[in-house]
């Protein structure tokens, strides 16, 4: 029923913003313990990067909620739901790591969430093929972003690196699922606009 779905998505949104996310998988752990403690500067930098990643997961929840709600076929809804469920793991993992680093989520999370929700609705109104294409492009850009973070994170921060690496693996899977479900490639201007918006978000969330 539509009402039940609305209540469920509202609950998920509240959990995304309040940090009470459920995880279906445990937090990834490094294969080897860190060889050294993080310096204060390394902790600050790692926290900034993980805050950016947490914001990305807040946005992912909003995007996929909106796209699932506006999807026209059961198969598209299932694709968005599966991705959202795994992204909720990412949300919980990054929140957990921020606490370990004695840091906090972005102060602007309600703004990020609202913006992503609006974008998800807009993508959904263009039809399932475009909406799934938007998901595929989002996941490609997130994959590249996470690869960049793996090169930026301090070598000693094996805990954050384990989380980010598993997130990257999941994003690749989500992007492939969206393409396999019928997602079309977005035009270059749309992809460039998405990259520009992402850059604004990441540069702001690192500090705020």
From Swiss-Prot:
InterPro entries: COQ7_proteobact (IPR047809), Ferritin-like (IPR012347), Ferritin-like_SF (IPR009078), Ubq_synth_Coq7 (IPR011566)
Keywords from the UniProt entry: Cell membrane, Iron, Membrane, Metal-binding, Monooxygenase, Oxidoreductase, Ubiquinone biosynthesis
Name of the protein: 3-demethoxyubiquinol 3-hydroxylase
Location in or out of the cell: Cell membrane
Membrane disposition: Peripheral membrane protein
Catalytic activities: a 5-methoxy-2-methyl-3-(all-trans-polyprenyl)benzene-1,4-diol + AH2 + O2 = a 3-demethylubiquinol + A + H2O
Taxonomic placement: Bacteria, Pseudomonadati, Pseudomonadota, Betaproteobacteria, Burkholderiales
Gene: coq7
Cofactor note: Binds 2 iron ions per subunit.
Enzyme class: oxidoreductase
Pfam families recorded: COQ7
GO biological process: ubiquinone biosynthetic process
Alphabetized PANTHER family for the sequence: 5-DEMETHOXYUBIQUINONE HYDROXYLASE, MITOCHONDRIAL, COENZYME Q10 BIOSYNTHESIS PROTEIN 7
Membership in a protein family: Belongs to the COQ7 family.
The keyword Zinc-finger is assigned to this record: no
Record NCBIfam families: DMQ_monoox_COQ7
Cofactor dependence: Fe cation
EC numbers on record: 1.14.99.60
Pathway entry: Cofactor biosynthesis; ubiquinone biosynthesis
Key word Magnesium present: no
Residues the entry annotates as binding Fe cation 2: 87, 139, 171, 174
Entry GO CC: plasma membrane
Residues annotated as binding Fe cation 1: 57, 87, 90, 171
Function statement: Catalyzes the hydroxylation of 2-nonaprenyl-3-methyl-6-methoxy-1,4-benzoquinol during ubiquinone biosynthesis.
Gene Ontology molecular function: 3-demethoxyubiquinol 3-hydroxylase activity; metal ion binding
């Amino acid at each position: 029923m539509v009402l039940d779905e609305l209540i469920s998505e509202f609950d998920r949104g509240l959990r995304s913003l309040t940090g009470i996310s459920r995880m279906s998988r445990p937090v990834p752990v490094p294969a080897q313990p860190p060889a050294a403690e993080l310096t204060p500067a390394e902790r600050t930098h790692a926290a900034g990067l993980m805050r950016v990643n947490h914001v990305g997961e807040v946005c992912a929840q909003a995007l996929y909620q909106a796209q699932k709600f506006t999807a026209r076929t059961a198969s598209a809804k299932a694709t968005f739901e599966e991705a959202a469920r795994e992204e909720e793991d990412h949300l919980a993992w990054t929140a957990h790591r921020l606490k370990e680093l004695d840091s906090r989520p972005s102060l602007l999370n309600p703004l990020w969430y609202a913006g992503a929700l609006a974008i998800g609705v807009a993508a959904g109104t263009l039809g399932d093929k475009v909406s799934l294409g938007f998901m595929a492009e989002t996941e490609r850009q997130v994959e590249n972003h996470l690869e960049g973070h793996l090169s930026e994170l301090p070598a000693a921060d094996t805990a954050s690196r384990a989380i980010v690496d598993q997130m990257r693996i999941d994003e690749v899977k989500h992007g492939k699922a969206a393409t396999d479900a019928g997602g079309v490639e977005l035009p270059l201007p749309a992809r460039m606009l998405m990259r520009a918006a992402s850059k604004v978000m990441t540069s702001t969330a690192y500090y705020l």
